[in-house]
């Protein structure tokens, strides 16, 4: 059964220059206990898709089309009478059944509030428990995520922790209410390589211990290979390919997916390896392409790619791609 179903989601932002079409007709599903990786360059729409889901869009952003069904309930903004009613509902589930691990703990954590205050806040907001009980749970969460001496450190401030330990606090806050869905938005971006590996090991072990479903937003295909069951490749505000991790890594279909893979070094390859960066820049979403969003950077682009958005081609029940190269209707 799908825990999350996003259908034809579009999100825009009003700016002085015009409307930015940040998310365009995105459809995704997530099963209970599954880990889905969303991969793409900066500005591809990964984070804004998740902010649309969680009701965390900036004031100039709005969902213009589509539906979002979470845990059997339609939580699309249009399903509510007004924004006030929608925001009130989202506050009830955000931090409770649906949580987010943000990429920059220094920004997310309040530097003038003790860790205890920030750890027990979701528990006090969403659970009918006393402050003493909430503190006990907070201490156990700190132990669970590998923070030493929790009885001492719970009384400290975030700035007294290292970057890796601050990220562990973020993870503990996300886990506080045993959420059904955890969204991890580039959770290792601000960390050095050694600490990145430790945090990923932690997320992997917590995944095995809980029933939570996870959406991992990243540009790092190594993270995807390690943690994810399925992968969605995003470019120019659109999902261009989805598949299992094996299908994406061993049988990629979209030229953008192939381009991403060609940028990754293979540590098992003894020969000198030449990496091939993708030429060009992502499309301007103030004026997105009429056809395929990747057309201006694609070495295999055809005339139809410029004028018509590719239809979805299905290679298996789990593997779909939007590319004219693989479509039976394409005029070569």
Locations of regions flagged by a protein language model:
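A short, flexible loop at the N-terminus of ABC-type nucleotide-binding domains that lies
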Residues: 3, 12-25, 56-62, 78-90, ...
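P-loop NTP-binding/switch modules centered on Walker-like glycine-rich loops
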Residues: 55, 183-187, 191, 195-273
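Conserved ABC transporter NBD signature motif
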Residues: 63-77
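Conserved ABC ATPase "signature" region
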Residues: 73-74, 132-152, 261-262
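ABC ATPase NBD coupling module
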Residues: 75-99, 125, 247-252, 283-289
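A short, proline-enriched helix->beta-strand linker immediately N-terminal to the Walker B motif
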Residues: 176-180
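Charged, flexible cofactor/metal-binding loops and thiol motifs
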Residues: 244-332
């Amino acid at each position: 059964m799908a825990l999350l179903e996003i259908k034809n989601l579009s999100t825009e932002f009003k700016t002085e220059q015009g409307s930015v079409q940040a998310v365009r007709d995105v459809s995704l599903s997530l099963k209970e206990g599954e880990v889905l990786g969303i991969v793409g360059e900066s500005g591809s729409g990964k984070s804004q898709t998740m902010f649309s889901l969680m009701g965390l869009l900036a004031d100039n952003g709005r969902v213009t089309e589509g539906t979002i069904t979470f845990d059997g309930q339609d939580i699309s903004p249009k399903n509510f009478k007004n924004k006030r009613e929608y925001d009130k509902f989202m506050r009830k589930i955000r931090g409770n059944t649906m949580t987010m691990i943000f990429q920059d703990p220094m920004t997310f954590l309040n530097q003038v509030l003790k860790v205890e205050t920030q750890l027990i806040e979701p528990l006090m907001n969403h659970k009918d428990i006393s402050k003493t009980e909430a503190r006990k749970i907070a201490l156990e969460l700190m132990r669970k995520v590998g923070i030493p001496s929790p009885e001492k450190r719970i009384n400290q401030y975030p700035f007294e922790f290292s970057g890796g330990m601050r990220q562990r606090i973020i993870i503990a806050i996300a886990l506080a209410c045993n959420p059904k869905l955890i969204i991890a938005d580039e959770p290792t971006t601000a960390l050095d390589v050694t600490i990145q590996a430790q945090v990923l090991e932690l997320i992997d072990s917590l995944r095995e211990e809980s029933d939570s479903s996870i959406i991992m937003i990243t540009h790092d295909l190594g993270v995807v290979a390690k943690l994810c069951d399925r992968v969605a490749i995003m470019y120019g505000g659109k999902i261009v390919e989805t598949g299992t991790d094996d299908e994406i890594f061993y049988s990629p279909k979209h030229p953008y997916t192939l381009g991403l893979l060609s940028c990754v070094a293979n540590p098992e390859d003894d020969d000198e390896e030449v990496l091939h960066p993708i030429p060009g820049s992502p499309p301007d979403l103030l004026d997105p392409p009429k056809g395929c969003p990747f057309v201006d950077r694609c070495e295999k682009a055809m005339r139809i790619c410029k004028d018509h958005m590719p239809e979805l081609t299905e290679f298996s029940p789990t593997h779909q791609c939007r590319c004219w190269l693989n479509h039976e209707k394409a005029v070569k």
